[in-house]
């Protein structure tokens, strides 16, 4: 039988993907901006503004939908702590922070490679770390006996650290390759789209696996014994 916390985790998947789309939009626009040498936007300031605007719009939609879905899920589960729903709006805002930081780095960093690499690192870290924190907050809102934040993150890290490291091993060289192409004037729209596509696929896989591992952690806590791992 599917437990309440597992139902709640899955009810938040769609909402999580919505605000997660803000990060994907950042990756796509940032990559195109890097490869078009000012053709997409007149200057980096305009590009940074566009990236931040896209993120704010998607983040706002995500916050509204997340609030609605979580409220509905808690009502169906007869939860008592509906005041915790407001915490999810905070997470919707948190989801927009990487975009703001990336925009600032683009504006002040110009064509400096370390700033592009740091931007990629921030996006990757946000995509990997915010998802388990989100589903943990949802679990605590409905299940007062759910694992503590430390235990759920420790469990997640023990199962997920190799994938986390593999992601950065793949994403950082990809960013460096993109910067190199841009620096030597050999970038093409095809390469830009391919780079954005690969990054999006990596983010998508990271999200699905993180949610799956978190669900397993909750089920193990509820049944009191290990269940089948991924």
Mark where each language-model region is.
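Interfacial aromatic "cap" segments that immediately flank transmembrane helices
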Residues: 1-29, 82-101, 131-176
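Short secondary-structure boundary segments
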Residues: 4-10, 112-121
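Juxtamembrane/transmembrane-helix boundary motifs in multi-pass membrane proteins
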Residues: 13, 17, 43, 47, ...
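Alpha-helical transmembrane segments in multi-pass membrane proteins
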Residues: 29-67, 118, 122
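Juxtamembrane "helix-exit" motif on the non-cytosolic side of transmembrane helices
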Residues: 34-43, 103-114, 177-191
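Juxtamembrane transition segments at transmembrane-helix termini in multipass membrane proteins
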Residues: 47-48, 54, 58-80, 133-143, ...
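Alpha-helical membrane-spanning segments of integral membrane proteins, especially the hydrophobic core
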Residues: 52, 56, 81-108, 116-124
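Small beta-barrel nucleic-acid-binding modules, principally OB-folds
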Residues: 120-136
């Amino acid at each position: 039988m599917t437990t309440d916390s597992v139902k709640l985790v899955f009810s938040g998947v769609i909402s999580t993907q919505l605000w997660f789309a803000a990060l994907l939009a950042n990756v796509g626009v940032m990559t195109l901006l890097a490869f078009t040498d000012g053709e997409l936007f007149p200057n980096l300031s305009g590009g940074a503004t566009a990236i931040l605007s896209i993120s704010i719009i998607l983040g706002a939609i995500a916050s509204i939908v997340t609030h609605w879905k979580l409220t509905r899920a808690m009502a169906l589960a007869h939860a008592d702590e509906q005041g915790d729903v407001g915490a999810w709006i905070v997470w919707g805002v948190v989801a927009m922070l990487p975009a703001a930081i990336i925009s600032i780095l683009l504006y002040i960093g110009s064509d400096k490679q370390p700033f592009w690499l740091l931007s990629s690192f921030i996006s990757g870290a946000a995509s990997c770390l915010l998802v388990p924190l989100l589903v943990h907050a949802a679990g605590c809102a409905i299940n007062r006996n759910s694992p503590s934040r430390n235990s759920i993150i420790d469990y997640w890290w023990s199962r997920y650290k190799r994938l986390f490291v593999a992601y950065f091993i793949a994403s950082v060289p990809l960013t460096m390759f993109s910067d190199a192409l841009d620096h030597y004037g050999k970038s093409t729209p095809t390469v830009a789209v391919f780079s954005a596509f690969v990054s999006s696929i990596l983010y998508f896989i990271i999200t699905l696996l993180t949610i799956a591992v978190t669900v397993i952690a909750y089920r193990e806590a509820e049944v009191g014994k290990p269940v089948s791992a991924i």
